[in-house]
Amino acid sequence: MSQVKLKPKKKYGHIDGCVRCGRKRGIVRRYGLHLCRQCFRETARQLGFEKYS
């Protein structure tokens, strides 16, 4: 018999923490970013966000 490889189960819903540093509080989930607010401030320019005021 041939070996059947199972794929890991895909996780749906909220991500546990920031994908960059792992922090659990202050998560920015809008547009699928999943960054904490501190990491968002550090990387916003590279992501294409501009500050107008």
Swiss-Prot record:
Keywords: Metal-binding, Ribonucleoprotein, Ribosomal protein, RNA-binding, rRNA-binding, Zinc. The keyword DNA damage does not apply. Its cofactor is Zn(2+). It holds the Pfam family Ribosomal_S14. InterPro entries: Ribosomal_uS14 (IPR001209), Ribosomal_uS14_arc (IPR023676), Ribosomal_uS14_CS (IPR018271), RIbosomal_uS14_euk_arc (IPR039744), Ribosomal_uS14_sf (IPR043140). Gene3D superfamilies: 30s Ribosomal Protein S14, Chain N (4.10.830.10). SUPFAM superfamilies: Glucocorticoid receptor-like (DNA-binding domain). Zn(2+) binds at residues 18, 21, 36, 39. GO terms for cellular component: cytosolic small ribosomal subunit. Belongs to the universal ribosomal protein uS14 family. Zinc-binding uS14 subfamily. Binds 16S rRNA, required for the assembly of 30S particles. Part of the 30S ribosomal subunit. This is Small ribosomal subunit protein uS14. It comes from Thermoplasma acidophilum (strain ATCC 25905 / DSM 1728 / JCM 9062 / NBRC 15155 / AMRC-C165). The lineage of its organism: Archaea, Methanobacteriati, Thermoplasmatota, Thermoplasmata, Thermoplasmatales.
